[in-house]
Curated annotation (Swiss-Prot):
Pfam families: DUF711. This is UPF0210 protein NMC1568. Signal peptide: none annotated. InterPro entries: UPF0210 (IPR007841). Homodimer. NCBIfam families: PRK05313.1.
């Protein structure tokens, strides 16, 4: 890869003035060779493999950050879904495995570890059910472990028994963790991807190599600055500006990923192009949409503006790298985006509008705080709606929702750090309890007739 001096100067400006960073270098680690019928042996095997494969990740990230002057905010680990790895143990709880993941991740100094996961889009094995029922206690007794459940796919349909259990699991987690914070580390997916470097939904897919490096970049501030400084008038020209900017962002991520791969002697997997916001001013996806001409994110036209942004980011990124993967789009996490927070506080950005926006962007209803008395079946209904959008449109969708115990609409909750804070948003008054309790499976959609 040849780098021009002009690109270097642009990168310096992106970092210094526009909040550009490499959000994460994530090592995916396969744990199939750790399987044992004895859960204590399994835990020791898991600890040994993670601490062996990942031991140099943090030092490498610090070296590359200093060498290139680009912040690398997080170093993370993702592992094979634990429901698959722990099944042979026949244990009635996998909380000890979560605690082992937590201990191993802390030992090597990473920010988060993902993969306390179950893939149940077509049905639940006994091990899958044990894992899902272990999630609340696992989130309570660990600090940096992230969990995910894949409840549907375009090919399998939606497993409504799993959707019901997921809603109950989130509700229980909210009740036993301070201000529901444990729920910030749980994602429920439809069409989950196997090479996602971002938390909380990262896991290492069964089709992946023994270890792989996946990189996530972040540059909402860079895109907004490019639009501010351009003379684009039509939306066609806006799309072109975004596309060219995404190309530049992606080139930096590609460089960091391939350098990390060489230093760690681990294959380079993918570069995730997702625009991932932070609560910092100037690092917001919502403000990009407003720069396009919306008075406030969430008003009419927001979904169209987001569709333009998402598509232009993908087009620009694909020209800059042959290893684009993961989720690759725009994230819209309410609590992690100061523009989204402001729009939600103003009452313009609602749960319904966010649901519509997820039909055209990366992932889905993300980091949304709802009243603590929200029933489990309502959470399951929200998950089912989001999964349906993903299933029908052949895309990844997800829900990361936090029922905040003791809080109601109008209150707010502080999560801190990259997770930010969120206003508590209202949910519908009507009940979907009978619908959710029916269980079964929503069949996979027909593919030949698309309307």
């Amino acid at each position: 890869m040849s780098i021009q001096s002009g690109e270097i100067l642009e990168t310096v400006k992106m970092v210094a003035d526009q909040n550009f960073d490499v959000r994460t270098i994530t090592i995916g680690i396969d744990l199939h060779d750790c399987i044992s019928t004895d859960i204590d042996v399994l835990n020791q095997n898991i600890y040994n493999k993670i601490t062996t494969v990942g031991k140099d990740l943090v030092a490498t990230a610090k070296y590359l950050s200093a060498k290139y002057g680009v912040p690398i905010v997080n170093q993370r680990i993702s592992v094979t879904p634990i429901a698959q790895i722990a099944a042979a143990s026949k244990a009635d709880s996998y909380v000890s495995v979560a605690q082992t993941l937590d201990k191993a991740a802390k030992a090597i100094g990473v920010s988060f570890i993902g993969g306390f996961s179950a893939l149940v889009q077509k049905g639940m094995s006994p091990s899958d059910e044990v894992l899902i029922r272990s999630i609340p206690e696992a989130m309570k007794t660990t600090d940096i472990v992230c969990s995910s459940i894949n409840v549907g796919s375009t090919r399998a349909g939606i497993n409504m028994d799993a959707v019901k259990l997921a809603g109950e699991t989130i509700k229980r987690t909210a009740e036993i963790t301070p201000e529901g914070f444990g729920c910030a580390k749980i994602v429920v997916f439809c069409n989950a991807v196997e090479d996602n470097p971002f938390m909380a939904g990262a896991f290492h897919g069964s089709g992946e190599a023994d270890a792989v490096i996946n990189v996530g970049v972040s540059g909402p501030g860079v895109v907004k600055a490019a639009l501010e400084n351009s003379d684009a008038t039509t939306l066609t020209e806006v799309a072109e500006v975004v596309k060219k900017t995404a190309f530049k962002i992606t080139r930096v991520g590609e460089l960091i990923g391939r350098e990390a791969s060489k230093m760690l002697n681990i294959p380079f997997g993918i570069l995730d192009l997702s625009l991932a916001p932070t609560p910092a001013v100037g690092d917001s996806v919502a403000r990009i949409l407003e720069e396009m001409g919306l008075s406030v994110c969430g008003t009419h036209g927001t979904t169209a503006a987001l569709a333009l942004l998402n598509d232009a980011v993908k087009k620009g990124g694909m020209m800059a790298s042959s290893a684009v993967g993961g989720l690759s789009g725009a994230f819209i996490p309410v609590s992690e985006d100061e523009g989204m927070i402001a729009a939600a506080e103003a009452g313009v950005l609602t749960l319904d509008k966010l649901e519509a926006m997820t039909a055209v962007c990366s992932v889905g209803l993300d980091m949304i705080a709802v009243p603590g008395d929200t029933p489990a079946h309502t959470i399951s209904g929200i998950i089912a709606d989001e999964a349906a959008i993903g299933m029908i449109n052949s895309k990844t969708t997800a829900v990361r929702i936090i029922p905040v115990t003791g809080k109601t609409v109008g209150d707010s909750v502080e999560f801190g750090g990259l997770l930010g804070y969120a206003p508590v948003m209202p949910v519908k008054e009507g009940s979907c309890e009978v619908f959710v309790n029916r269980g079964g499976r929503i069949p996979a959609p027909v593919q030949s007739m698309k309307n």
